[in-house]
Amino acid sequence: MSAFVGKYADELIKNAKYIATPGKGILAADESTGTIGKRLASINVENIEANRQALRELLFTSPNALQYLSGVILFEETLYQKSSEGKPFVEILQENNVIPGIKVDKGVVELAGTDGETTTQGFDSLGARCQQYYKAGARFAKWRAVLKIGPNEPSELSIQQNAQGLARYAIICQENGLVLFVEPEILTDGSHDIAKCAAVTETVLAACYKALNDQHVLLEGTLLKPNMVTPGSDSPKVSPEVIGEYTVNALRRTVPAAVPGIVFLSGGQSEEQATLNLNAMNKFDVVKPWTLSFSFGRALQQSTLKTWSGKKENVGKAQDVFLARCKANSEATLGKYGGGSGTGLASESLHVKDYKY
């Protein structure tokens, strides 16, 4: 029995289980103002609130796309925004059986005593902010920790600091009614092979779940948002089947069965590659006590963004592209994706070194 004593236990378990519904996944639309500015700049669109709102409205009102989503991660600005018709985005999502979530961290800062490793900030007034987000309709939260693989990295200090930070955030969120996404992202930057990534992933996840248990976090009211286990960005590529096997094995060794779902970040992979890898994991024939799904940002939005290009007349076409990507990833969560949605834009790599958002 969990030592969790918060009043929201039943609600947390119910919401986490729903988010992990097979066939559904997460749209990560929580880019900071600076990061979405870079995305808009790539299509020559000015970074003003009206344009940020227009992009989010395009996504949230795409006909038939939301049936493939169980949650959407929002940035604070977006949590309070409305559609052009005056309807709050939160209501639009809720009416389509999509749970709104919120990014609660404030980005990373350098961890003193390390060679450029980082820790995540955002604990100031976190409890009060969670209360406000809950009142606004959010029912889950995301906190991103970032680790890197290098000659001596991640250091033990970095692993422990980030694990303890994730656990501290987790219990504060749960005490205020928010399911938490635990996101210890190991960057793909580097020339390491897939076995090295697997070993580091296992070490980091083991530390995270030790810290979560020490903080009496209710695991049934959490989801894990990890990196896929892949070779470094400067290493030779391997097949989706190899990535699927290494990833699932690493998770089976470290993630308790009490966790209802694991939703992967795309980590700069192309849209199509991320989908193929997710499909391979779900086809890998071993016992998996949790659902394996997606929590993609760039890998759901990039070709949609390019198709839209900030023009009203392109909204319909862009929404069709978004629907196709949502459907493809839904199929991948069931191990039923046959490929073929990756022509053109969907095959472009989205890797950004030392990615921050």
UniProtKB/Swiss-Prot annotation:
One of its GO terms (biological process) is glycolytic process. Its EC number is 4.1.2.13. SUPFAM superfamilies: Aldolase. Pathway: Carbohydrate degradation; glycolysis; D-glyceraldehyde 3-phosphate and glycerone phosphate from D-glucose: step 4/4. Pfam families: Glycolytic. InterPro entries: Aldolase_I_AS (IPR029768), Aldolase_TIM (IPR013785), FBA_I (IPR000741). Substrate binds at R52, K142. It is found in: Cytoplasm. It catalyses: beta-D-fructose 1,6-bisphosphate = D-glyceraldehyde 3-phosphate + dihydroxyacetone phosphate. Keywords: Cytoplasm, Glycolysis, Lyase, Schiff base. One of its GO terms (cellular component) is cytoplasm. Gene3D superfamilies: Aldolase class I (3.20.20.70). It is an enzyme of class 4 (lyase). The active site is at E183 (proton acceptor), K225 (schiff-base intermediate with dihydroxyacetone-p). Belongs to the class I fructose-bisphosphate aldolase family. PANTHER family: FRUCTOSE-BISPHOSPHATE ALDOLASE (PTHR11627). This is Fructose-bisphosphate aldolase, cytoplasmic isozyme 1.
